[in-house]
């Protein structure tokens, strides 16, 4: 009999969002008259901007003609998209990158998981708590950890609690680690890191020969001009950081699927015999072996984001979601809730009232308000007693959900 990967059996219960879906379905079946408003999983609700949709249509039409047909493309992505990314996303920040350092993918969730392929198993990993579950679970799946303890912490991972006391910004590990996961603007807490805070992490990584995995999936939602959009705005970061970006929330690509990874040629690792080796070369080898590239129409649509018309339309949608965030944040504050985030990120992180647990508050909102959010404890032990609401709903639903919650909590 073929043997399974027993590491999967270490995972705690089900993945967070499928578990939420299961509970909501059960409630809806028992209460078919209920109008349930979902502000939980961060899926977008606005349609693709017209300029992006036109590029999509034009690319599909290209596939219908011999002269413009596109088959297998470059595994790393088409140069016309990569050059647009460099010019419009990085050069404006004062960051210079080579085309060889950017890899177009089918989404940052996969990238955050797949990047582990090029790192040795005995690397020590540091992860924030609370955290996007993919960081934690993928390390469990590949066998980097032991079993979880009663808190949900897996042996072999260094957890960095993010609490009210430290402003939900992790503090530097006291021990040496090799891989550090950072996500700013943060999912789930909605917090951001200043240049000074990021400089501490870059300095730590360089001093300890560590690599930072920097998830910048929500950088387009930053409104404060003082907040960095990329880790590479920090001096020295190109020597120690790999950055992940996504079109999912920025341009509404959750159903389209496109992202990118930046692996600077300066980021080096060590072989088993102690020789320095480029992670860029390893990621290129991994990509060309395991990936055939994002589809041609998808990359054409992604490139349209960087046109003047495409970005103007995309920015309108980002502003729409951030207005939702303001409505949620201010509405909950009026109801007496302690709230964080929602200023430079599309997530609102609220403290559950009356000392309720995260799942107790989930059930209260679902059954009494018919509103779905995400229990903070699902993101890690330090998320207990907190709750995440997403600003990605449509305006009418957001206003209605906030009014229901305010009425219930008063």
UniProtKB/Swiss-Prot annotation:
GO terms for molecular function: L,L-diaminopimelate aminotransferase activity; pyridoxal phosphate binding. One of its GO terms (biological process) is lysine biosynthetic process via diaminopimelate. Keywords: Aminotransferase, Pyridoxal phosphate, Transferase. Pyridoxal 5'-phosphate binds at residues 72, 108-109, 132, 187, 218, 246-248, 257, 292. The keyword Transferase applies. Pathway: Amino-acid biosynthesis; L-lysine biosynthesis via DAP pathway; LL-2,6-diaminopimelate from (S)-tetrahydrodipicolinate (aminotransferase route): step 1/1. Its cofactor is pyridoxal 5'-phosphate. It catalyses: (2S,6S)-2,6-diaminopimelate + 2-oxoglutarate = (S)-2,3,4,5-tetrahydrodipicolinate + L-glutamate + H2O + H(+). InterPro entries: Aminotransferase_I/II_large (IPR004839), DapL/ALD1 (IPR019942), PyrdxlP-dep_Trfase (IPR015424), PyrdxlP-dep_Trfase_major (IPR015421), PyrdxlP-dep_Trfase_small (IPR015422). It holds the Pfam family Aminotran_1_2. Its EC number is 2.6.1.83. Substrate binds at residues 15, 42, 109, 132, 187, 292, 388. The keyword Magnesium does not apply. The modification N6-(pyridoxal phosphate)lysine is found at residue 249. Belongs to the class-I pyridoxal-phosphate-dependent aminotransferase family. LL-diaminopimelate aminotransferase subfamily. Involved in the synthesis of meso-diaminopimelate (m-DAP or DL-DAP), required for both lysine and peptidoglycan biosynthesis. Catalyzes the direct conversion of tetrahydrodipicolinate to LL-diaminopimelate. NCBIfam families: DAPAT_plant (TIGR03542). Homodimer. This is LL-diaminopimelate aminotransferase. The gene is dapL.
